Amino acid sequence: RCNVTHNCTDISKLCEAYPRGGKKLRSLFSQFNTTDTIDWFENRNILLKTEKDGRMFPISDKSQTIIDCLVSETIRLKIDLQLGKSIEQMNQQGEGWKLQFKNLPTQHFDSIIVATGGSSKIKGFEWLKDLGHNIAAPIPSLFTFNMPNESIKNLMGLVVEKAKVRILNSKIQTEGPILITHWGMSGPAILKLSAWGARDLAVKNWQ
């Protein structure tokens, strides 16, 4: 459905909602925050709705609504959207950047944004390391719990609207809805716990 943003306009509280990197986001949210996001979409005739937990979605409940809006903006602004190109190398050149593509001519740009994606996209992190950036080891986050040997799976399909979940031998806990699945546990509370406890769980080898 595309969870566009969260209905929180207090920048301090918004930063606190990020398990990692919240302090670094403060200056960015001071320039463009939740209210700006809502206004941006409304100015393009995309209305958002707020659910009980504060998450905001397009009233259509379809992610395609957001995709269509963003694509329309690229067309309106005459942005050259290039797909299916593989970047082999990037280097800083003067005040700009030189990108070397696979089987294509080298191109020059004033600035670049590197969206590395998940931890499987190692090449993006290697580029950043080569440019002198320090990279914190990427680890899984926002995942469900696979519990193959637990009897709780017998309750598959059960939804508990108000549950409190905690990582064993840790102070990290969250509250909210959970869903019992055929593989273990899922739902907003579980996903949030996996985000806040990502590094603790990695140290425990997700056991």
Go through each PLM region and give its residues.
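Short hydrophobic core segments
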Residues: 87-88, 99, 107-120, 127-129, ...
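Short loop/edge segments at beta-strand edges and connector loops
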Residues: 81-85, 137-139
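Glycine-rich loop(s) and the adjacent beta-strand/alpha-helix scaffold that form part
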Residues: 111-153
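A conserved short coil-to-beta-strand element within the FAD-binding core of flavoproteins
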Residues: 83-97
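An anion/pyrophosphate-binding glycine-rich loop and adjacent beta-alpha core
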Residues: 7-11, 134-137, 147-207
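Glycine-rich phosphate-binding loop signature in dinucleotide/nucleotide-binding domains
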Residues: 77-82, 104-108
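Short, basic, low-complexity termini and linkers enriched in Ser/Thr/Gly/Pro
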Residues: 93-95, 101-108, 167-172, 203-205
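Conserved N-terminal/central alpha/beta ligand/cofactor-binding core
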Residues: 1-80
